[in-house]
Each structure stands twice: as C-alpha cells, then as structure tokens.
Amino acid sequence: MAKKDYYEILGVSRNASQEEIRQAYKQLIKKWHPDRNHQNRKEAEEKFKEIQEAYEVLSDPEKRAMYDRFGYVGDVPPNAGSGGGFGGFGGFGGFEDIFKDFGDFINNDIFNIFFGDQRTSSRQKQRRAKRGEDINITVDVPFEQVFTGTTIPIEYDRYEVCSHCNGEGVEPGSGWVSCPKCHGTGVVREERRTFLGVIVNQYTCNQCGGTGKIPGETCHVCGGSGRIRKRHRVEVKIPAGVDNGTVIRVQGKGNAGYNGGGYGDLYVNVRITGHIDFERRGNDLIKEIKIDYVEAILGTKVKIKMPDGRVKEVKIPSGVQDGENIYVYGEGVPDMRTGRRGDLILKIKVDIPKRVSRSEKKLLKEIAKLRGKDVDEEE
C-alpha cells in the first residue's frame, strides 16, 4: 500500500506552522464535507477521512515529529508487508536488497546493527506517558441560533481513566514484577553464528515494552489498558456568527491518555441547518422581495421577519428598479470574533401583472397620455 503524504493531503509545506495546518484543515473539511457533496458523496467521505487522518497526525507535535522522521506513525510502517523495507529511508533500499537473500534474520540484524530498531523506539514511546487521542464530532446548529449563539449538550463515547486501577493497568495490591523475558533489563540480546561471524541482535523487550517490569496481575476492569469506555456529556458553547464548517476545540474532552498522559481534545464540527428565506454570504444576509409595480413607482414599506424572530420594517423608495438591491446596514450575521454585524440585502423583484382589470387599464391609459406615451388603445 502506498504511503500517504499528509502534507500533500492538506496542501501545506513540510515546514508549515500549526496555524497554517489548522487553516488548511478548516477549508478542506468545508469543501469535502459529505453533506455538501451529495452527487459524489462516496468520494467526499473518503477525502473527509483522509483529511481527518492527516490533521490528527500533523496537529500533534509528537506524532508529526515521528511522521517526519520515519514516514509513518505507529508500530508498523504502511508498506511493511509489501517488501518495501526501510519505508522512511528510501536511499538505503539498494543496501537492504544486498542482504535479502540471506534470510529475514540476517537482513533484520544487519539493519539493527547499523541503524537501530525503529520499531523498538515506537514501542518504548507507548510505555511512557502518552496523550490521549482527539475526538471529532459533527453537530447541527439551527440557522436561527447563528444570530444569538447557543449552548449545545453533546453526548459521546470516550475512553476515561480506569477508576479501579487509577490508570495503572494493574490490579490494586498486585504491584509490578520483573519481566521474565528480559530479566528486568528491558532489552533482549540474541547471538547467532553465521558465515559472516557472530551477529548480535539487541532489541527492546516486546513483553514489557522496555520497562523491565510487567503487572503482577492485570486489572480485571480495563484489561491492563488503564482506560475504560464511557458515555460522556459536555456543554459546548456555540458563539454567535458561527459558520458552516467551523471547528470548535474543547480542550481536554477527548480520550484519556496512557500511563498518566493527559486527555486529548474534542473537536466539534459545526453544520448549519439551512433557512429557506435567506441566503448567507459571509456575514451578509440576502433575501428576495417581490413588490407590485405600483409599489415600485410610488414606494412602499415591507416587513421582514428576521431569523432571530424580530420583525424589521424596511422602506422601499419610490422608483426602485427590478433587480436593484436595498441595503439595511447592521442587520446581518454577527462576526464570530468582533461581534460586528454584516448587512441585510433585499433583492427587489418587481411583479408586472399579465392581466389587469378594465378600470385599472383605463387609469393606466390616462397616465400614459399624461406622460405622452402612445399605447395600444385596443381592449
């Protein structure tokens, strides 16, 4: 399987700042959100998952550092099963091929001697305190609440610290004992004789993860992970002016960490449920208003029911033209950061009747004569 380039997925350079990565992520999830791509939803869902995966790695300094160094995050590189070998060090591919005919043992040992066991380093990290994973959730926010802001209760599943063992993964009272495989050293050393001589293979003990100790008895509640899955509820504040695709970070509300590591964060992706009477462009609101041709000539007043429930009376000046825009300043959506409101824009649509009554037609002909217009006299 080809290795994914997370920088390419987000469209940022390898030295991009966290803010640049965050901005790129926000733009891409807006573009590829499945609910905004009904015609190619399957492709959008795949893209959306790729974007989330890339952001999860590049937004975490520890994961990003590992990805930059090795080309992957986790114990096993993406192409480990395909014979690609040293995934993060393409320049050594030819050197690895020289030894591949000697068997897996010699091949692995040679690389361990010269470059160390990369997989070991990732295992050691897992035994140290590690921050919990972030959680992403999408919530629907009614368009009306964009004006005032709101607080939304959210329930979701997350991993929390096991209360029985206090996150240790060990049954209380049993403690830790010396690892029988590495005898408490955290390192396993093997010597093998080959036609090249004695080759020493040293690697981190995979039974204790390099700590030299194992649980005397594994916690029966969490199975040794130190975490248990629970239903969690949190109140999330949605600020006024929030837009579709906005991501709100709630610190410390993600999954519990490992071995005393802190909680990850909760990322709330906002999806605005539409309003059929208004169109939003930035912080401006646009609404089409139909008026009679007589109202267009003489001027009129219209009452607009705003999304927040208020009724706004707007004066339409005499002589307004079809397609003209009437601006009502400061009646749009509030800016999420400054609080300053956009404008309400009324697009005028003048309704010209196809048929009029006899009396109305007679009056119109009189007006036409006053204006010196030659009109059809036929009934």
From Swiss-Prot:
Zn(2+) 1 binds at C162, C165, C219, C222. Zn(2+) 2 binds at C179, C182, C205, C208. It comes from Thermosipho africanus (strain TCF52B). The keyword Chaperone applies. HAMAP family: DnaJ. InterPro entries: DnaJ, DnaJ_C, DnaJ_domain, DnaJ_domain_CS, HSP40/DnaJ_pept-bd, HSP_DnaJ_Cys-rich_dom, HSP_DnaJ_Cys-rich_dom_sf, J_dom_sf. Its main location: cytoplasm. Belongs to the DnaJ family. Its cofactor is Zn(2+). This is Chaperone protein DnaJ.
